[in-house]
Amino acid sequence: MRILEFDEKRQAVKLHIESEDDLWLLHLILEKDDKVVAKTTRDVGLGKESRRIPMTIILKVDYTEFQEFTNRLRIHGIIEDAPERFGIKGAHHTINLDIGDEIIIIKQQWNKYVLDRLKRQANKRSRIIIALVDFDEYLIAIPFEQGIKILSEKSLRPLNEEEGIIEQNALEIATELAEYVKQYDPDAILLAGPGFFKEEVSKKVNAILKNKKIYIDSVSSATRAGLHEVLKRDIIDKIMTDYEIAIGAKKMEKAMELLAKQPELVTYGLEQVKNAIEMGAVETVLVIEDLLSSDEQERLTIERMLEDIENKRGEVILVPKESPIYFELKNLTGILAILRFRIN
């Protein structure tokens, strides 16, 4: 995401959309009665015919729809302004926002926490492709803020099938991996697996992709369980420290360890966490993003809490439904805080 302009007087932010993560964030921050200015198309009657006409409109937002990994955000609302010759003011309309588009978002008042989220998103540039490989299977995935997208999950030909099968299988993986690298243009590749096969794959990848950074790591299997394992590793933090999905999993693991050994350093529940924030005791808070889409009063309360945490140098991690820790956190009321010190 690029922030092209912020007009404080109009409370208008102009953005250029660069990734699915950007669309996901806009889905979270767009609220009913916000206004958006964007290019769109609409069927317009021209005599006896109708044609789909491109135009720029102002839309008063009703609600948004986002389906992860579709590269599109649908913004539903009422047309507040459009070229008069088309006579469509007041009509219902849906703007399809895609990667590469620009949009202006106008709010009555931009919340500092939400603006800071936009700025953090604009500073995110790193992306990594993860390939887990073993002699008989492999998995290729890419992390987004809203979850992990599995790009490929396949079995390989058995080792006893023919001579040179290890090299052939390594080339098969490397060739497919190279295609995904061209598509997603990651900053780095993480190759992980239980044996030496990952080194064979790395050689083939290096032969195809000359200037792409490759990290090697060990993992127990080339499966989804192995993927969950590698997401908790320090190597992931090293490569993509700004991806909350990896950080969130590690923080949740820390919270569970503290609950077992030092439960006084963890609290959960809206009122309990709010109390801890007021005392300046919160080091990290994890919150499911559903709570930011709940009724207006609760959402405003949570937004103020999160802003207060960051003002006191605490860390906020928003957990989407696609996160591996989502249901675990939801079962703990949806909001949990790791504390700097014990409180009553």
Curated annotation (Swiss-Prot):
It is found in: Cytoplasm. Its EC number is 3.1.-.-. The keyword GTP-binding does not apply. One of its GO terms (molecular function) is metal ion binding. Belongs to the eukaryotic release factor 1 family. Pelota subfamily. PANTHER family: PELOTA (PTHR10853), PROTEIN PELOTA HOMOLOG (PTHR10853:SF0). This is Protein pelota homolog. The gene is pelA.
